[in-house]
């Protein structure tokens, strides 16, 4: 009989997939396991990636607020966990409804011991949104 042992790596891969599918795809911010003091860097944040947003509720209000009306379908492609099991990346495609385009995204998440996201950085070319 094969054991169904769930490893930390398995949990991190699932977190990345759930972020894409249950968070962005289902338009459910509360499905994303952000720590209260999370830091987010994203090209479409006010000030871009060089100006991080701090705090879960601040991210909900500034970054997340327009997303449910802008995001269409998402397609999870793959994830990667680093050797130290402290970070996971998710590769996915995100359909944007206005202007119509598909963003090819890789997001990196740093995870704490409680399994919460403490840092997130989004990597993608924003030109399809900013210069359609």
What is the meaning of each model-derived region?
Residues 1-4, 15, 44, 48, ...:
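Residue-level detector of alpha-helix boundaries and kinks
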Residues 2-37:
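Short acidic-aromatic low-complexity motifs
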Residues 2-6, 61-132:
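A beta-strand edge to alpha-helix "cap/lid" segment located at domain peripheries
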Residues 9, 50, 129:
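Short glycine-/acidic-enriched loop or helix-start segments at secondary-structure transitions
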Residues 13-16, 56-60, 102:
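A structural signal for well-ordered alpha-helical scaffolds and beta->alpha junctions
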Residues 28-86:
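A solvent-exposed, acidic/Ser-Thr-rich amphipathic alpha-helical stretch
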């Amino acid at each position: 009989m094969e054991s169904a042992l769930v490893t930390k790596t398995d949990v991190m891969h699932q977190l990345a997939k759930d972020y894409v599918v249950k968070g962005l795809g289902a338009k459910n911010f509360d499905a994303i396991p952000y720590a209260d003091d999370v830091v987010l860097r994203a090209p479409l944040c006010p000030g871009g990636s060089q100006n991080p947003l701090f705090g879960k509720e601040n991210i909900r209000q500034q970054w997340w607020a327009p997303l449910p009306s802008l995001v269409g379908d998402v397609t999870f492609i793959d994830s990667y966990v680093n050797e130290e099991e402290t970070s996971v990346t998710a590769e996915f495609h995100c359909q944007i409804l206005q202007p119509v385009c598909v963003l090819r995204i890789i997001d990196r998440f740093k995870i704490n011991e409680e399994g919460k996201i403490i840092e997130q950085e989004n990597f993608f070319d924003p030109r399809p949104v900013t210069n359609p």
